[in-house]
Design a protein with these regions (language model features):
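A contiguous strand-loop segment
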Residues: 1-95, 128, 326
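Compact, glycine/acidic-enriched structural inserts
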Residues: 30-48, 85-125, 307-320
Length: 326
């Protein structure tokens, strides 16, 4: 059901990383949307988007994005929030009314920073609109970061959006962020350092090696376990002057919470990580790694993409690449 985190480096690169976990095959296509693109919202007149962006276009209706980064460095991903997300049953006068999945397009198309978001989101109303392809009203919440390094979570309550400063810089699924943060108290003993040997009576009990400090780190795929595991790994990531190392470390954390096919089954269908993604707010770069490939693909949000007349759909190789050495 998706894991996300942000990570900031000494060179002022601000990353937002996520897994896209789902049962329904999205067959997502990386798509660049130019600035001033005319977008038809479901519940409002068509509008020109102020900013261009790149994200993965999910095949669950007309232009639905699960994540993206815009030309100002604002990056966002959505995550299921089952049992917690609540939407409005009626339009609100004077508000921008939209379907749950359209919030990402609104954020990327109209906001330039977290501060800008906090101001504009006060007049957004999320409606209880069903996605006809999925046959549900998607229960969503969001993690967002910007070029200044701020990270927030956004939760819908009766259609209105609550913006929360996310100091842990991790988001999974239900329950609410505050519950996850409080739950971290149960894991305060975790450490990258090995535990010390202890004398019990006359018996010297030796530590179980250099990994002993991680004994008790949750290993399952529930929302609560993934939150703890991601928080621990993200918090202890080393800083490198080589930005390619920082980028790869983000993908390594995603590996630790990615769900392989067969590990989780929902109603007879496999629920797995369909792709991993890291977005760089400083360079406006979008790095994606689909499940069936070992390659990372980069899309640079440049002026060529931003000044086109229409969307650009970008093909990604989904095959395994092996380099033979003899």
């Amino acid at each position: 059901m998706c894991t996300g985190f942000s990570f900031f480096t000494q060179q002022q690169h601000h990353y937002l990383a996520r897994t896209m976990d789902f049962t329904f095959e999205f067959n997502g296509v990386p798509t660049a949307v130019p600035r001033n693109f005319e977008y038809q919202f479901d519940l409002e007149p068509s509008m020109k988007l102020t900013y261009g962006f790149v994200g993965t276009n999910l095949k669950v209706g007309r232009y639905r994005f699960g994540d993206g980064i815009n030309e100002c460095g604002v990056a966002i991903s959505n995550h299921y929030f089952t049992g917690e997300a609540s939407y409005s049953k009626h339009k609100r006068y004077g508000y921008f009314n939209m379907a749950p999945e359209e919030f990402i397009i609104w954020v990327l198309g109209f906001t330039k920073s977290i501060q800008d978001l906090k101001h504009k989101v006060k007049k957004v109303n999320i409606m209880n609109e069903k996605n006809e392809t999925l046959n549900i009203v998607p229960p969503l919440h969001f993690i967002i970061t910007d070029r200044e390094g701020h990270t927030v979570s956004v939760e819908p309550h009766n259609g209105l959006l609550i913006v929360k400063d996310n100091h842990v810089k991790v988001l999974t699924n239900a329950p609410k962020l505050e519950w996850h943060v409080e739950n971290l108290r149960n894991y305060a003993f975790l450490s990258p350092e090995k535990s010390t040997n202890q004398l019990v009576g006359k018996v010297l009990v030796r530590s179980m090696g250099c990994e002993a400090g991680t004994n008790g780190l949750p290993g399952g795929y529930t929302s609560t376990e993934r939150f703890v595991r991601t928080t621990y790994l993200r918090h202890h990531l080393p800083q490198s002057h080589d930005e390619s190392v920082n980028l790869m470390n983000c993908f390594k954390v995603l590996d630790a919470v990615s769900i392989p096919q067969g590990a989780v089954v929902d109603a007879g269908e496999t629920h797995y990580t369909q792709y991993q993604l890291v977005m760089d707010s400083k360079d406006r770069a979008y790095y994606i790694k689909p499940y069936f490939t070992n390659q990372i693909f980069k899309i640079q949000l440049n002026e060529q993409l931003l000044t086109k007349k229409d969307m650009t759909f970008i093909d990604v190789n989904h095959q395994l690449t092996i380099t033979q050495l003899n």
